[in-house]
Structures are given as structure tokens and as C-alpha cells.
A protein has these predicted regions:
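Structural helix-boundary/capping segments
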Residues: 17-21, 126, 131-169
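Short, surface-exposed loop/helix-turn segments at secondary-structure junctions
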Residues: 67, 102-127
């Protein structure tokens, strides 16, 4: 649950900063405008807007809910997570990067609209926890699932980028 909270709070803050600094020709300049655009644009009706709308409803990174979720996730990622493995001499944690993306049937075919996955149904991402703990994460191609690419992550202790690159090569 904390992963989703961190995602939606950070998504709003970071996307608003990006859009505000984007080229003047860019029509969508904020998350609020993105939500409005997605509700009107037919191409966007394929996707559930739950995460975008949840992000838009957040209040900011000083919200106690966000602060608590971030502190919990950092603790679980670092001292209670990857740090323990690295303390035992593990050189790299090897894990799938995340779950595969969903297939989108071509427009005009049965099942073109993608149903929203129930909230909280996605497994936690090892990549996000590595980022929270400040650990490098190198992703390499692992294969395909239903014709879509999937990745394999090599997560190492701080400053192990050279070793991870050597392993991946």
C-alpha cells in the first residue's frame, strides 16, 4: 500500500514540475489539465485513469500520509531489506524488474477497453524499493511474455554500478 501512496504523491509533484517547464507548444501544463484531457480524448479511454485521478487528489509531499509511507518504505527497503542481504555478502539481488504490461487489443476489436485492475493488486516492485534505499538497479532484457518484453533487475549495494555492468555484460 505504501508503494502506491508514494507513487501517486510523487507522480503529481514531478509531473507538474515537468509540464510547467515543458515547451510552450505543450497544451497540457498540469496534472489537472491532464485529467481533463484524458476524460475527453477517445484514445485515452482504453486505460483506467485511477492512478492519475488519485494522484491529482493528493495534497503534497508534506502530507503526513506521504511522509509516513515514505519513511516506512525506506526502512523496509534499506535497514530491513536489501541492507540485510548485502551484509551477508550478497553481491547482487537478481529479480524480475516488474510485472509485464497488459496487452491492448487493436481498436475496433472485442475487448479493446482494458478493465482497471483492482487497487493494490500489483505486486510490490523490487525496483522501487532499490531506488528508495539508494541502490543501483540495472535492468537487462529477460525475454517476452505474450510477445511483450520483460526485464531482469540486478540490484547492488551503493557504488556497485561497475560490478553490475560487468555482470550484465
Amino acid at each position: 500500500q505504501e508503494q502506491r501512496l508514494i507513487l501517486i504523491y510523487d507522480f503529481k509533484q514531478d509531473l507538474n514540475a515537468y509540464l510547467a517547464a515543458s515547451a510552450p507548444a505543450q497544451k497540457v501544463r498540469s496534472m489537472t489539465e491532464l485529467v481533463a484531457f484524458n476524460k475527453v480524448d477517445e484514445r485515452e479511454k482504453v486505460w483506467s485513469q485511477d492512478l492519475v485521478e488519485a494522484a491529482e487528489a493528493t495534497s503534497g509531499r508534506d502530507d503526513p500520509e506521504y511522509v509516513e509511507a515514505l519513511a516506512y518504505a525506506k526502512r523496509k527497503a534499506g535497514p530491513e531489506g536489501y541492507d540485510k542481504a548485502f551484509a551477508y555478502g550478497v553481491v547482487a539481488v537478481v529479480t524480475p524488474t516488474g510485472q509485464p504490461a497488459g496487452l491492448i487489443p487493436p481498436p475496433g476489436t472485442a475487448g479493446h477497453t482494458i478493465s482497471a485492475r483492482p487497487k493494490g493488486s500489483s505486486p510490490p516492485s523490487p525496483s522501487m524499493y532499490a531506488a528508495l534505499a539508494g541502490y543501483p538497479n540495472l535492468t537487462v532484457p529477460m525475454g517476452q511474455v505474450e510477445g511483450l518484453p520483460v526485464g531482469l533487475s540486478l540490484i547492488g549495494p551503493k557504488w556497485s554500478e561497475a560490478q553490475l555492468l560487468a555482470m550484465a555484460y
